[in-house]
């Protein structure tokens, strides 16, 4: 089985530790960063399959980070992470090229299903280009 590589971008360190631990137990390779600038720098050096991207972060917003990921790393799928108050941002993310969005709080199995679907979507798109 192929191990999916995921980058989680969120400004809450405790949330990052929790998600990393829970996804790693489910055979997902997880790296974490705390802001959009760090995400873009990480992606330049370490390609991943899926980015889980918080909408609301200090500095470069999740939406602006998404725009840069779509421009520079077109084979990387993005799942926007949003709170109930920012549902519109998740929908905006979809219109800007995110694969999906998920509302906090969420179940880890729901997130894992979306990660797997995003991974498969990217894999099929890459195969069609060959």
Residue ranges and their predicted role:
Residues 17-25:
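Charged docking surfaces used in two-component/phosphorelay signaling
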Residues 27-34, 42:
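Short hydrophobic/Thr-rich beta-strand motif most characteristic of the beta2 strand and flanking loop
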Residues 34-38, 61-64, 85:
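Acidic catalytic/metal-coordinating carboxylates
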Residues 41, 63-74:
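Short amphipathic alpha-helix used as the core "switch/output" element in two-component signaling
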Residues 57:
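Receiver (REC) domain active-site loop signature in two-component systems and cognate sites
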Residues 86, 106-116:
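C-terminal output helix
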């Amino acid at each position: 089985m192929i191990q999916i590589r995921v980058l989680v971008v969120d400004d809450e360190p405790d949330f990052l530790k929790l998600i990393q631990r829970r996804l790693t137990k489910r055979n997902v390779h997880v790296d974490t960063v705390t802001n959009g600038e760090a995400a873009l720098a990480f992606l330049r050096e370490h390609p991943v399959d899926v980015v889980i991207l918080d909408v609301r972060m200090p500095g470069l917003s999740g939406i602006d980070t998404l725009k840069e990921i779509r421009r520079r790393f077109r084979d990387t799928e993005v799942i926007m992470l949003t709170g109930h108050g920012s549902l519109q941002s998740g929908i905006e993310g979809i219109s800007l090229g995110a694969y999906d969005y998920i509302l906090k709080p969420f179940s880890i199995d729901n997130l894992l299903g979306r990660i797997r679907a995003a991974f498969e979507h990217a894999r099929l798109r890459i195969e069609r280009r060959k």
